[in-house]
Amino acid sequence: MATIEDNYEPFTLSSKPIDYIIVLGGWHTENAALPATSQLNNDSLQRLVETLRIYKIHPEARIITSGHHKSDTVSNAEKMKQSLVLLGIPEYKIITENFPKDTEEEAELISPRVQGSTVILITNADHMPRAMKYFQAQGIQPIAAPTGFWVKNTDSVKGWNYYLPKSKKLQQTTRAWYESLGRLVQWFKTIFN
């Protein structure tokens, strides 16, 4: 997983003003008894926290949330917006793109709006290489802001406990395969288009 995640450094600070912070969609499970933030899955929650962190550094930026609704009545873009507002971001600073079903559609739908702007792209570290390629194919050169790193410290000394089976490692392997297959599909599309 580290080889997938190491393509982009975590975001620190941009020397120029940021026009947009783009937060790619994730998942949520609707439950009216829970606050919006508690309805987000882990990926969405990690992206939400990174959005808040970067917005605190660059309050001049507008935030674009994206993602459709799958089987829920509210899109992931709208649920992220609700969560951001709940955490203090002014509603007028947030734009929702409620219809993209995947990263490729997100890039296609968002790119015309941000053309010629300075943008930050937030998604999970394992997904960032593929996401960047989709936006670059649309003529956008975003600043990567990866979050949700699976591998936190590649330089640490590994004790015997590291080599014991863990369910997290199975999740990591599943995600690594998912992203690797996604990149392969992306590559095939460039050949046949």
What is each model feature region?
Residues 3, 173-193:
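A transmembrane-helix-recognition feature enriched in membrane-embedded lipid enzymes
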Residues 1-170:
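A structural signal for short, hydrophobic/glycine-enriched beta-strand patches
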